[in-house]
Amino acid sequence: MKTFTLPASVLFCFLLLIQGLGAAPPGRPDVFPPPLSSEHNGQVAEDAVSRPKDDGVPEVRAARNPEPQDQGELFQGVDPRALASVLLQALDRPASPPSVPGGSQQGTPEEAAEALLTESVRSQTHSLPAPEIQAPAVAPPRPQTQDRDPEEDDRSEELEALASLLQELRDFSPSNAKRQQETAAAETETRTHTLTRVNLESPGPERVWRASWGEFQARVPERAPLPPPVPSQFQARMSESAPLPETHQFGEGVSSPKTHLGETLTPLSKAYQSLGGPFPKVRRLEGSFLGGSEAGERLLQQGLAQVEAGRRQAEATRQAAAQEERLADLASDLLLQYLLQGGARQRDLGGRELQETQQERENEREEEAEQERRGGGEDDVGEEDEEAAEAEAEAEEAERARQNALLFAEEEDGEAGAEDKRSQEEAPGHRRKDAEGAEEGGEEDDDDEEMDPQTIDSLIELSTKLHLPADDVVSIIEEVEEKRKRKKNAPPEPVPPPRAAPAPTHVRSPQPPPPAPARDELPDWNEVLPPWDREEDEVFPPGPYHPFPNYIRPRTLQPPASSRRRHFHHALPPARHHPDLEAQARRAQEEADAEERRLQEQEELENYIEHVLLHRP
């Protein structure tokens, strides 16, 4: 087996690159690197020979780490593709046959590598297009024989080493923000210097545009023919080497990616052609990675926003439906309550016929009252009619108050359904109808008056809007009409006894009873000493009137008994001789409040029926 002697040339190229970068900073290509020291070269060569071939990734990354101060800033602002081109050119020279006999065989690869390295460094520091350097002439390969089999093995080993080195170089990217800023600043300075020089030479805008366009064309690489297919082994090694997450950062930090591609693809392709291996096309995946992540995040946010909007819309629809259903139930209950009350103030729904019948009935009553007055009993009959009218009005108000109380109690409950409310409200109507039928004795009117068809149609339409069945509305209307007919033909009800006048409403709180009058009160001028013979019964008064059980009466001048009771009025129990006054005042206050509440509820119900139900289309 032939010994492996390639790492020496590779390390030599590394040293040349390091010294060139240290001597020529970005933007100043006139400074050339100083000569290398033999001691440093030998030390680095020994370290490189002792390093195993497969375990190169940690050491190369450690060499790229800018933190140690003894090694300096390695690969400061260097494109990894340019570095790869230098290494490939250096690896290609030992494999080629010697073109110069004698001692020149050793110096030819070194000179070619140095020239290629200098050109690569200049391409990194200059924004102007660098002239292509022709690859050194390679002698035609000798015919393959069986004696050259070891060389082919060495060639395959070299290709494997090159693939591993390329994998390491692809993983390399300057993640330091400071390094990116320095590289971008150097390129901007170089570009500004170039454009300024062109402007100074020929200030015309056309010349400046041509210079910029020529620079752009020089930077963009020409399309080369497609390379031969990639070997399977090399393709597998390249597919395994995935780019690091910092690759898109490298693309963002560099202002013109085409410049780097144009400067590095040409020497790298020539090096591959000299080795006889294929040249893989370099594709920029940074933008695709970045664009894919941003697009996915944007789509995810849009989807979440759409889901949230749909959820809010469904919630609003559900709340609106619940509100509409609740209002419909309330309106249906109010309509049913109004129909069961008899339609005392029905104007448009009840129709005109009912109002005409009521007007005729009132006219008949007035005529009868006038006839009775003419007969001689005007005063008595007038008083009886007034009392009957008052009694009827009071009975009607009591019935309405009871129904309103039931209605508002059901509205506050809010949990019972419309069917339960309807059944609770229809039951009193049936009971009253049966009671009136029993009192009437089974008499029925033959002349059944039918309601106006328009009124019935309007009621049915209103019931449909209020979620009430049409059959229920028709039955309710028929029951109300039958009740009115029976009430019209029924004998007059007995007049109830007059109700006691309610207490005045201005009394809000019961007044305390007046104090009891003092007994055996002596004049003030005779109050030298208390008359013990006259107050024997008050020395120890009974317990309820004494604030303390162990009270001791002092033997000094005391005020009269009446004044003492005034002092202890807050501790005494309420007077026993006025128990009915407080109860009467309390009852009067409660009745006044109930009457006020009833009138207010009645007024609200009438306003709702007149302004909402009757005017609804």
Swiss-Prot record:
Residues 149-160, 378-397, 437-452 have a biased composition (Acidic residues). The keyword tRNA-binding does not apply. The modification Pyrrolidone carboxylic acid is found at residue 313. Disruption phenotype: VGF-deficiency produces a lean, hypermetabolic mouse that is resistant to diet and genetically-induced obesity. GO terms for molecular function: growth factor activity; neuropeptide hormone activity. Keywords: Amidation, Antibiotic, Antimicrobial, Cleavage on pair of basic residues, Coiled coil, Cytoplasmic vesicle, Growth factor, Phosphoprotein, Pyrrolidone carboxylic acid, Secreted, Signal. It comes from the Eukaryota. Residues 491-501 have a biased composition (Pro residues). The modification Phosphoserine is found at residue 423. GO terms for cellular component: extracellular region; extracellular space; Golgi apparatus; transport vesicle. GO terms for biological process: defense response to bacterium; generation of precursor metabolites and energy; glucose homeostasis; insulin secretion; ovarian follicle development; response to cAMP; response to cold; response to dietary excess. Residues 182-197 have a biased composition (Low complexity). Residues 48-64, 345-364, 418-436, 577-599 have a biased composition (Basic and acidic residues). The keyword Secreted applies. Residues 1-23 form the signal peptide. Residues 29-75, 93-204, 239-262, 345-599 are annotated as: Disordered. PANTHER family: NEUROSECRETORY PROTEIN VGF (PTHR15159:SF2). This is Neurosecretory protein VGF. The lineage of its organism: Eukaryota, Metazoa, Chordata, Craniata, Vertebrata.
